[in-house]
């Protein structure tokens, strides 16, 4: 029987993030936003990158790790890892609930991270949970 307070497993160190623009998955996201909406997605919403960075800290993963944990290549095609998608969907909901402010602000934070996943091929339902 495994105890949730098992002291044999060392605690996970906090992820050390590089500037987000250095991650391939972030470039994919920003390129997709630019193609879809135009403008400069890195600057047209100054909260966009800080929100993703905050989520990465919450999940303790860098952006590329998140995409690796939610996708795989099978038979030469990118596929979604269902367990990974479910895990991150729940993490987004949990993180979104910790955001200070209105329901709309919480929804924007969650939907920003969902947008990152969607533009990297991980389809998620949009939501204003809160």
Question: Language-model segments: which ranges?
Answer:
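N-terminal DNA-binding module of tyrosine recombinases/phage integrases
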Residues: 2-36, 118-129
